[in-house]
Amino acid sequence: MRHQDVAIIIPSRLSSTRLKQKPLQLIGSITLIERVFKQVNQAGLEHTYVATDSEEIASVITKVGGKVIFTDSAIPTGTDRTYEAFKLIPNNQNINYIVNVQGDMPFIEPSSILKIIEYLKNSKYDIVTPIVKVDRESVKASSNVTVVVDSAGTALYFSRSLIPNGAEEFLYHVGMYGFRKNALEKFVSLKPTFLEKTERLEQLRALENGMTIGTCLVENVPISVDTEEDLKKAVKFYENISKLGL
């Protein structure tokens, strides 16, 4: 298998404030977390894991041949859960890059995962994350995050507000991160910062501490499921692609 020095970790906890037992919600006849895992698994990497605190989630994943790492339910963030899971991977000294894929994107494209891995390996960035060019209507929801970058594609700032102000086209941030191992270790050692807590965006902790985040363009905005309304959209999308035989 390719990229033997890369681990993909999908953090997934059962408790959710906005959508009860979110990972186990059905899209068609398949749970959200199973759909995420199956999409990610198409990237073809050996070291692909779901990190969870739930026996129910673990059961779903192991039944389809996936690998699970149990992490403490008290872990505060997805990135912290990713790091805790990484430390429990057998022979992890051979892993130099870790990709954190959020467990709420049931139609994430495997090509996007491979793209950030290649970009991370061929750059000097601490972290790499995907972005999509979108218009104003596509990002008006408060759960969406936009980013501004410099001429080289280095992230300058992320926000839940539309930035830059007054623009008609924006860069939508896709919730997936590729870390160098030492960058992930540094990130989790840092305390939450003012901007991170204000915007409720973990990646600002990295920027406030001088870490570099590179961005790479991908084509499609993946559906993220955070609310009941998001779930309805995901089900509708699934029904539409099923009719087309995709």
Curated annotation (Swiss-Prot):
It catalyses: 3-deoxy-alpha-D-manno-oct-2-ulosonate + CTP = CMP-3-deoxy-beta-D-manno-octulosonate + diphosphate. The keyword Lipid metabolism does not apply. InterPro entries: Cytidylyl_trans, KdsB, Nucleotide-diphossugar_trans. GO terms for molecular function: 3-deoxy-manno-octulosonate cytidylyltransferase activity. Keywords: Cytoplasm, Lipopolysaccharide biosynthesis, Nucleotidyltransferase, Transferase. The keyword tRNA processing does not apply. GO terms for cellular component: cytosol. It comes from the Bacteria. Pfam families: CTP_transf_3 (PF02348). One of its GO terms (biological process) is CMP-keto-3-deoxy-D-manno-octulosonic acid biosynthetic process. Its main location: cytoplasm. SUPFAM superfamilies: Nucleotide-diphospho-sugar transferases. Pathway: Nucleotide-sugar biosynthesis; CMP-3-deoxy-D-manno-octulosonate biosynthesis; CMP-3-deoxy-D-manno-octulosonate from 3-deoxy-D-manno-octulosonate and CTP: step 1/1; Bacterial outer membrane biogenesis; lipopolysaccharide biosynthesis. It is found in: Cytoplasm. Belongs to the KdsB family. Activates KDO (a required 8-carbon sugar) for incorporation into bacterial lipopolysaccharide in Gram-negative bacteria. This is 3-deoxy-manno-octulosonate cytidylyltransferase. The gene is kdsB.
